[in-house]
């Protein structure tokens, strides 16, 4: 990046729109469901028909409160809705109902691990609002689908408290994980049920100023998010370095950009509107939203154990590697799978590795995730137990795992019963003969081992396992090999 670039840092904040998985929309009884025929899930409220009046969805309020509790935010006893006016084909009323001045949640935080370091990212606020419709382009014309118009959203606004693309991606991952655990959204990026807008400015390292921010709209993958932030950081720094004596506000004006993944650059969409351009005013058709402390406490009691707490428990109670613990808790279904497996297997480290590495890789190759394959947690526990008890070798265990993923309906015990050829070598006399032969043919390695070169033992074990096609019990191989070398 060059020496000059290293003297600058990013300042990043995220605005995340999350569609709530309610049965109906935020202010109308119309169905809230993705993928239906265009303009079939609408009502007069959705399309802004004269005389139609909004009625607030109680379940959407509960889900917003639940999120506020999950992030330890301050849930407001009194909040209010406002009209945000703008003119666009996907907004039939020409305004959005949002919470501009009095959001339902203020504050809160998201905890994440960034490159091995635990960080806490502060939230500014979370507010309820309704979604817009969707423009669909067909060659030389466009249509509008209002099925999405009125779908309940929470917009989660962070403080400008991230200073690298790695921070932003870790924050986004942790946020998605929390939303999944509390079950208020499916967070499907491809369907647009969670949308990330990132705000970034740069400043000289050590400065506390906040310069004009650029918003990059609708990041639909974490990879693109990281790439866009790095590219925009470079662009802004180069602009400031090119015009060192100009007013910074003129060098990098506040604007909205999009990410072009093919050109690997951010592309200007429009200059930023000011708040007054939206002509905010109090929504006249909705009363103040009042919530009691008792209601908030009742909602808080329904919170499950959250990812960060679970992560710390896995490291402490199960003594598993931090990177594997992070993978396990990232998805509540995977975490549940692991915890169920621990009831049958106490080798937690091996279990975590088999779930997050061996089985995860095999399932991904088939477009699946382990908890949704039909493979039972008890079967993975059984596989690890078989290895620990010497029933099978690690090599054979991987063959069994291949068969488990291929069939999605057989336990290790079932597979061994149907394929006895997978069982380990039990002929001790034959194994002794192989060990004796390997020792006789590799006298140099034997001498190296006796002279203190521990790697030589691994080489000799490898030769024996190769000749037995991985079926020799490793523990017995070591016993016989050491005995054979002592007798030389």
Swiss-Prot record:
Quaternary structure note: Heterotrimer of A, B and C subunits.
EC number(s) given by UniProt: 6.3.5.-
InterPro entries: Asn/Gln-tRNA_amidoTrfase_suB/E (IPR017959), Asn/Gln-tRNA_Trfase_suB/E_cat (IPR006075), Asn/Gln_amidotransferase (IPR018027), Asn/Gln_tRNA_amidoTrase-B-like (IPR003789), GatB (IPR004413), GatB_C_1 (IPR042114), GatB_Yqey_C_2 (IPR023168), Gln-tRNA_amidoTrfase_suB_CS (IPR017958)
Source organism of the structure: Chlamydia trachomatis serovar D (strain ATCC VR-885 / DSM 19411 / UW-3/Cx)
Membrane-spanning intervals of the chain: none
Gene symbol of the encoding locus: gatB
Protein's name according to its UniProt entry: Aspartyl/glutamyl-tRNA(Asn/Gln) amidotransferase subunit B
Family: Belongs to the GatB/GatE family. GatB subfamily.
Keywords assigned by UniProt, alphabetized: ATP-binding, Ligase, Nucleotide-binding, Protein biosynthesis
Catalysis: reaction(s): L-glutamyl-tRNA(Gln) + L-glutamine + ATP + H2O = L-glutaminyl-tRNA(Gln) + L-glutamate + ADP + phosphate + H(+); L-aspartyl-tRNA(Asn) + L-glutamine + ATP + H2O = L-asparaginyl-tRNA(Asn) + L-glutamate + ADP + phosphate + 2 H(+)
PROSITE patterns cross-referenced by the UniProt entry: GATB
PANTHER family the record matches: GLUTAMYL-TRNA GLN AMIDOTRANSFERASE SUBUNIT B MITOCHONDRIAL AND PROKARYOTIC PET112-RELATED (PTHR11659), GLUTAMYL-TRNA(GLN) AMIDOTRANSFERASE SUBUNIT B, MITOCHONDRIAL (PTHR11659:SF0)
